[in-house]
Curated annotation (Swiss-Prot):
This is Protein K15. It comes from the Viruses. Plays a crucial role for reactivation of the virus from latency, early viral gene expression and virus production. Modulates host signaling pathways including activation of MAP kinases c-JUN-N-terminal kinase (JNK), ERK2, and NF-kappa-B resulting in the activation of AP-1 and NFAT-dependent gene expression in B-lymphocytes. When expressed in epithelial cells, induces the expression of several inflammatory and angiogenic genes. Also interferes with B-lymphocytes signaling through interaction with host LYN kinase. The chain crosses the membrane at residues 29-49, 63-83, 89-109, 121-141, 148-168, 175-195, 200-220, 237-257, 264-284, 296-316, 324-344. InterPro entries: Herpes_LAMP2. GO terms for cellular component: host cell Golgi apparatus; host cell plasma membrane; membrane. It is found in: Host cell membrane; Host Golgi apparatus, Host trans-Golgi network. Interacts with host LYN; this interaction modulates B-cells signaling. Interacts with host ITSN2. Keywords: Host cell membrane, Host Golgi apparatus, Host membrane, Host-virus interaction, Membrane, Signal, Transmembrane, Transmembrane helix. It holds the Pfam family Herpes_LAMP2. Its main location: host cell.
Length: 489
């Protein structure tokens, strides 16, 4: 605890000095990008300070999440390229970045200890951190022109994986974080095209493959523990969307490597916007249930991204590259279409369950000759799923037997009984279950026999539906159990 508090205090002071150095860089370079980075760092700094002070003053501290420090470290490394001419700013930025990563690592260890981290989660967490540290060292030891953008992207995509397996979250979040780490591994493989030595190429390729392997390990571990009938639908839905995001990330990266045309700025913006939108929907659905709206939005955004990729693929000179990218695009389109069909199927099943909410077990009515333990196989005495309603019965009400007695003639209802009648919501189908005494059953067949086996029972000038079964003839007349429907007038 003392070590963690020491590093937090050291990180806060280093970041304050870093703000001063970055402000000098903003003044000297007049860069909008640097000013925006400084603004983001200020927001994250204030949020981290707020949680840090609450943790210090509380008896049961809840330490800030390490993603604050990770993003700040990425921004600091991004600004490191702008300060190569100033040794003071260079040293300040590097020190702040290292302190941010170390403090983030210690904070994650604190979270792991508090949550009683399991062994496999600890192995995944340690391996992930080793991959990220090696990736950072590879980027710092090389002088690539555009390498700074790929390390923040890969680090940001790796943060959900670290957070999910360090705090032992639910299966949906673990699955999404594993897919995110696979995409981070794909982004880590981009520097392979920029490496000038075999050591750099081998290191970057090893980092990429290690991240992809850890991501698939997380998916298998999550499915092994959470693959239960109640969650199979949403997990399959998230797996299909994860396949869409993985293939589209790979397609975008390959297009960035192989594309040689300069006038594709509009297509790049379209691809970037679609990917960001897809990731936002994907993360949002990991915390919520799948819905028809999000599934359709995901389908539209995925097809828009596919259309932009197809136009860029047609501009490539190599036939082999076009063939590989076309195959990946077809796989992405298949995944996106399947997730759209699946979310429509899940919504349809949910709607059927919602409409059929009237299918519930009703209380059984016993006669004087029966007791509570009497059990006969008469279908009318144990009705669970009633027959389909006629189309003109849309808003029936639930009438208890003490309110209405059709066997002795209907009476006018007073105000209290009307309130009891209209107590249920109008969209719920209800039934009035009564036992008619002195009823005469019609032995004549129905003029229009129904497949459900229903016959007409005449009661004092009225009619009631009864389920006709093979055992009905053996039951006494006073044991008949009718289902009488009363439509709302």
């Amino acid at each position: 605890m003392k070590t963690l508090i020491f590093f937090w205090n050291l990180w806060l002071w280093a970041l304050l000095v870093c703000f001063w150095c970055i402000t000098l860089v903003c003044v000297t370079t007049n860069s909008i990008d640097t000013m925006a980075s400084l603004l983001v760092m200020c927001i994250l700094f204030v949020s981290a300070i707020n949680k840090y002070t609450q943790a210090i003053s509380s008896n049961n501290p809840k330490w800030p999440s390490s993603w604050h420090l990770g993003i700040i470290a990425c921004i600091v490394l991004k600004l490191w390229n702008l300060s190569t001419t100033n040794s003071v700013t260079y040293a300040c930025l590097i020190t702040t970045a290292i302190l941010s990563l170390v403090t983030a690592f210690l904070t994650l260890i604190k979270h792991c200890t508090a949550c009683k981290l399991q062994l496999e989660h600890g192995i995944l967490f340690t391996s992930t951190f080793a991959v990220l540290m090696t990736n950072m060292l590879v980027h710092m030891s090389n002088t690539w022109q555009s390498s700074w953008i790929f390390f923040p992207i890969s680090f940001t995509l790796s943060l959900p994986f670290l957070y999910a397996f360090a705090t032992v979250k639910t299966g949906n979040i673990k699955l999404v974080s594993s897919v995110s780490f696979i995409c981070a591994g794909l982004v880590m493989g981009y520097p392979v095209s920029c490496c000038k030595t075999h050591t750099c190429t081998a290191t970057a390729a090893g980092l990429s493959l290690s991240s992809i392997y850890l991501g698939f390990t997380g998916i298998i571990s999550t499915l092994h523990k959470s693959w239960a009938p109640p969650k199979r639908g949403i997990l399959t839905f998230l797996l299909l969307q994860g396949g869409v995001l993985t293939t589209q990330t790979l397609t975008t990266e390959l297009l960035a490597i192989t594309s040689t045309t300069g006038n594709i700025k509009g297509h790049e913006i379209l691809l970037l916007v679609c990917l960001i939108f897809l990731w936002c929907l994907y993360v949002w659905q990991s915390f919520n249930k799948a819905s028809l709206v999000t599934g359709m939005l995901h389908l539209i955004a995925a097809w828009s991204h596919t259309g932009g990729c197809v136009q860029l693929v047609m501009l490539l000179p190599s036939g082999l590259t076009r063939g590989i990218l076309t195959m990946i695009i077809c796989i992405s389109t298949l995944f996106s279409t399947l997730q759209g069909l699946l979310v429509f199927y899940l919504y349809k099943e949910k709607k059927v369950v919602a409409v059929n909410s009237y299918r519930q077990r009703r209380r059984r009515i016993y006669t004087r000759d029966q007791n509570l333990h009497h059990n006969d196989n008469h279908l009318g005495n144990n009705v669970i799923s009633p027959p389909p309603l006629p189309p003109f019965f849309r808003q029936p009400v639930r009438l208890p037997s003490h309110v209405t007695d059709r066997g002795r003639g209907s009476q006018l209802l007073n105000e209290v009984e009307l309130q009891e009648v209209n107590r249920d919501p109008p969209n719920v189908f209800g039934y009035a279950s009564i036992l008619v005494s002195g009823a005469e059953e019609s032995r004549e067949p129905s003029p229009q026999p129904d497949q459900s086996g229903m016959s007409i029972l005449r009661v004092d000038g009225g009619s009631a539906f009864r389920i006709d079964t093979a055992q009905a003839a053996t039951q006494p007349t006073d044991d008949l159990y009718e289902e009488v429907l009363f439509p709302r007038n």
